[in-house]
Regions:
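Glycan-recognition and catalytic cores of secretory/periplasmic carbohydrate-active enzymes
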Residues: 1-259
Length: 261
């Protein structure tokens, strides 16, 4: 919706998002973000709230952002994570840094950097910018035989792009390129008519066998398949469009910054 609005200026997007966020304000805390997935990924909600706030200036949106943060899984712990699911980590580690934009609390910004480095110190013996979590990261499974979901690849790219916008730190641009050019192309066919659920750096076969427990998830997840792994089928297409979108960014002095590979 946000991308569509920036293309079309369709007022219905603003109206719909405003009404949705007004509804969220009415949801009691004990009913908000209850589910495992939504509780992990509340940071995406905050990103959209800030986007709308920057277009409308509606004060209630900042109150809602505080409410969402309060009810989202805690990604600020120094030595552990709320869960070890690869897509959650790639998508959610930036939640504290996102909320930092409202609070100015530098500890929140540092927390996102910490999660990024923590997962790679522990499970990062995997080239291509990612970490070993073929569904979930597991102690003892840390070498290049381990893989990561296609969803995890594109969510990591998106998070790197968002972190770049929030911090101006070129590390995030470099890391996004590392994933985009060294991991993502191996996960999809050039014509995007098939993808694999799990991609490993030391990936010598593309068969339909179950490789559990070496691979955490049970199933035929090393094969290129146009029909399985619906989550990745719905998610993978954001990779290159968002990458291209973030090649041109605004600067604080009302200029533009062109990023080249």
């Amino acid at each position: 919706l946000q991308s569509y609005y920036e293309y079309s200026q369709d007022q219905r997007v603003i109206d719909l998002m405003t009404n949705y966020f007004k509804w969220q304000m009415t949801v009691p805390d004990d009913k908000l973000l209850e589910d495992y997935w939504e509780n992990s990924r509340g940071g995406d909600n905050i990103i959209s709230i800030y986007w709308l706030y920057n277009h409308t200036g509606d004060a209630f949106l900042l109150e809602l952002a505080e409410k969402i943060h309060r009810n989202t899984a805690d990604w600020t712990k120094s030595t552990s994570l709320p869960n070890w699911h690869n897509v959650n980590i790639a998508q959610c580690f930036r939640e504290p840094a996102t909320y930092y934009m409202q609070t100015g609390d530098s500890a929140m910004l540092k927390a996102s950097y910490n999660v990024h480095h923590l997962i790679r110190r522990t499970f990062g013996q995997v080239p291509g910018g990612m970490f070993g979590a073929d569904e979930n990261a597991r102690l003892g499974y840390i070498d290049p035989r381990q893989g990561v979901e296609t969803c995890g690849l594109v969510e990591q790219m998106a998070s790197d792009e968002i972190m770049l916008c929030m911090t101006g730190d070129p590390m995030w641009a470099e890391h996004c390129e590392e994933v985009a050019f060294n991991s993502y192309p191996a996960a999809v066919m050039p014509d995007f008519k098939a993808l694999r659920y799990i991609t490993c750096p030391n990936h010598t076969v593309s068969d339909s066998k179950n490789h559990h427990p070496g691979i955490d998830n049970r199933g035929p997840f090393l094969s290129m398949n146009p029909f399985s792994s619906r989550c990745c089928q719905h998610n993978h297409a954001q990779g290159w469009p968002y990458f291209s979108e973030h090649l041109v960014l605004a600067t604080p002095d009302n200029g533009i910054c062109l990023l080249y590979t």
